[in-house]
């Protein structure tokens, strides 16, 4: 009995071992206590939260208001002592208490591996595909920028989808339990943009199964599956309801709740306006954090629109990578466009703006 169980579990044990070894090797500098991963957003967060953390040390309790951001704002939007949550416990278990950034890659590996197994992929092919998912070029780019919550949220997406598929495949108990768990985990990582994209995928997946059930006249199963899915999702949301509620309320007073329009020129993309405020975030601003049109092809062809300009530091020396050569298309196009514009205008800001428009420049975010 034990021998049969071990034989069945062996491929999965090997898979976890491979994911752990590859993640550790890829993030080997993290094992050196003298080296620290430099993340711009995390550095900014440390600066923003410094006043709050110092007061917390002095008074022994967190402050509800901070004065060093935007002339004052609620502190829970930056840093506030959070109450204990089962999400934190399960997150540590799923990441094996691994140090940063090893834990990011390991989580993404096991989550995608779980989804692939549920989709009936063989363990050996699932290992390769899970590694491809976790170590795609976007992951280290996002981590270098400090988008920790984004990567953790993205890491739980495959697991949540897998749990949904279990419900749809009539494995009700496991599907319901894991859907509630992974919904709570995913929302608990607190990156609502990724959750928004997940809901689109989940809706398409559910619609596809529903159409198939209707065709096969499995209406009883459809009703049971959808009912369990709604209840499980409600439990997952309920675990995080406090955080979601206060953020939704604060959004109304933030830029994402609409921008004040004093002049028609302020509303460049002609967003709907109510009570002198735009409805939601302006499209031009929101899409600055998306891949550019050609940049999306970097998923298959790395460096198709050039590379970023991040650098690493070691032994006091900075190393810029990769080098932009005189023969690169990005360099040639930039020189051509700027030379033409500078010869026509003397206004530097105007030259910069037109250079971006005329050369069809990609967004400022990296997507190698």
How should these model regions be labeled?
Residues 44, 81, 157, 208, ...:
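Juxtamembrane helix-loop transition sites at the ends of transmembrane segments
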Residues 224-291:
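Polar, glycine-rich mid-to-C-terminal structural blocks
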Residues 19, 109-118, 124-213, 225-247:
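Membrane-embedded helix bundles of polyisoprenyl
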Residues 1-27, 224-233:
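Start-transfer (signal-anchor) and selected internal transmembrane alpha helices
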Residues 22-112, 131-154, 282-368:
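Membrane-interface coil-to-helix junctions
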Residues 221:
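Aromatic-residue-lined binding/catalytic grooves and analogous aromatic/hydrophobic interfacial grooves
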Residues 27, 31-35, 170, 191, ...:
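Transmembrane helix-loop junctions in multipass membrane proteins, especially transporters and channels
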Residues 10-14, 91-100, 121-129, 175, ...:
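Membrane-interface starts of transmembrane alpha-helices
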């Amino acid at each position: 009995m034990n021998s049969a169980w071990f034989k069945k579990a062996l491929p999965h044990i090997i898979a976890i071992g491979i994911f752990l070894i590859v993640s550790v090797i890829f993030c080997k500098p993290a094992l050196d206590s003298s080296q620290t991963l430099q993340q711009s957003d995390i550095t900014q967060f440390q600066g923003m939260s410094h006043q709050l953390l110092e007061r917390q040390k002095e008074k022994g309790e967190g402050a509800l208001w901070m004065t060093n951001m935007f002339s004052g704002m609620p502190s829970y939007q930056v840093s506030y002592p959070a109450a204990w949550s089962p999400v934190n416990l399960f997150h540590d278990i799923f990441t094996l208490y691994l140090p940063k950034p090893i834990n990011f890659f390991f989580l993404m590996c096991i989550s995608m591996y779980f989804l692939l197994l549920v989709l009936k992929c063989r363990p050996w092919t699932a290992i390769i595909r899970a590694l491809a998912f976790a170590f795609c070029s976007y992951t280290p780019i996002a981590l270098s920028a400090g988008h920790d919550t984004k990567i953790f949220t993205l890491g739980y997406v495959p697991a949540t989808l897998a749990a949904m598929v279990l419900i749809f495949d009539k494995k009700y108990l496991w599907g319901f339990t894991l859907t509630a768990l992974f919904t709570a985990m995913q929302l608990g990582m607190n990156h609502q943009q990724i959750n928004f994209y997940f809901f689109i995928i989940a809706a398409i997946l559910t619609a596809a199964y529903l159409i198939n059930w209707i065709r096969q006249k499995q209406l009883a199963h459809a009703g049971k599956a959808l009912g369990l899915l709604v209840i499980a999702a409600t439990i997952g949301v309920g675990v995080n309801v406090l955080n979601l509620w206060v953020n939704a309320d604060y959004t109304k007073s933030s830029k994402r709740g609409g921008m004040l329009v004093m002049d028609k020129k302020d509303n460049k993309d002609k967003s709907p306006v109510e009570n002198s405020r735009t409805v939601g975030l302006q499209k031009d601003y929101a899409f600055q954090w998306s891949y550019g049109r050609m940049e999306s092809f970097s998923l298959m062809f790395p460096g198709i629109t050039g590379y970023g300009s991040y650098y690493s530091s070691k032994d006091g020396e900075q190393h810029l990578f990769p080098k932009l050569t005189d023969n690169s298309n990005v360099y040639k196009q930039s020189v051509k466009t700027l030379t033409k514009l500078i010869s026509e205008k003397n206004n530097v800001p105007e030259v910069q703006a037109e250079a971006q428009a005329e050369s069809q420049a990609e967004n400022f975010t990296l997507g190698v």
